[in-house]
Amino acid sequence: MKTKSPQDDRILALAEPVAAELALEVVRVRIMSGKRPRLQIMADRTNGTGIEVEDCARFSRALSEVFEVEDPVAGEYDLEVSSPGIDRPLTTLPHFERWEGNEVKIELDRLAEGRKRFRGILAGVEDGHVGLDMDGEDDTTMIPFDWIVEAKLVLTDALIEADLKARGRGAATTEGDE
């Protein structure tokens, strides 16, 4: 997972083993500033079935025990453990592989083809590059993973249906649908 600071790296190093023990993966670590900083950790199940509230609560309790000893954030802060949501951030190459065929927004740390923001359909991963099929373009655009600072799935009906199906809650059929 890509992080934005050495502090995020330290938090991630503490959180990942705890997540692994619970069959979870850390999707993103962020510290939100304010009067009282908020440490936000997004997690998901490693089996792809989606994290539940109970999983978040267990992970939060386990992290609190570790963070109480290691103290990765100076001063008082609030710990928030949450699901990445349906329109989740993509932070690792395996995320881009897993969500191939879905629409995504990507922001880069530098210009590519004269811009930093892209939107299109994920077209796979090859040699550390993320493939993106964009409207009006004949060729797949290959973006170096290392240039990506933010990437997020776009909420679509197909994405919602895929999420429901993965959780075993596929769309209900009505009498005329059969």
Curated annotation (Swiss-Prot):
Keywords: Cytoplasm, Ribosome biogenesis
GO biological process, alphabetically ordered: ribosomal small subunit assembly; translation
Keyword set includes Cytoplasm: yes
CDD domains recorded: YlxS_C
Entries under Pfam families matching the protein: DUF150_C, RimP_N
Gene Ontology CC terms, in alphabetical order: cytosol
InterPro entries from the UniProt entry: Ribosome_maturation_RimP, RimP_C, RimP_C_sf, RimP_N, RimP_N_sf
Keyword Glycosyltransferase in annotation: no
Domain of life: Bacteria
Main location: cytoplasm
Subcellular location(s) of the protein: Cytoplasm
Family named by the database record: Belongs to the RimP family.
Entry function: Required for maturation of 30S ribosomal subunits.
Protein name: Ribosome maturation factor RimP
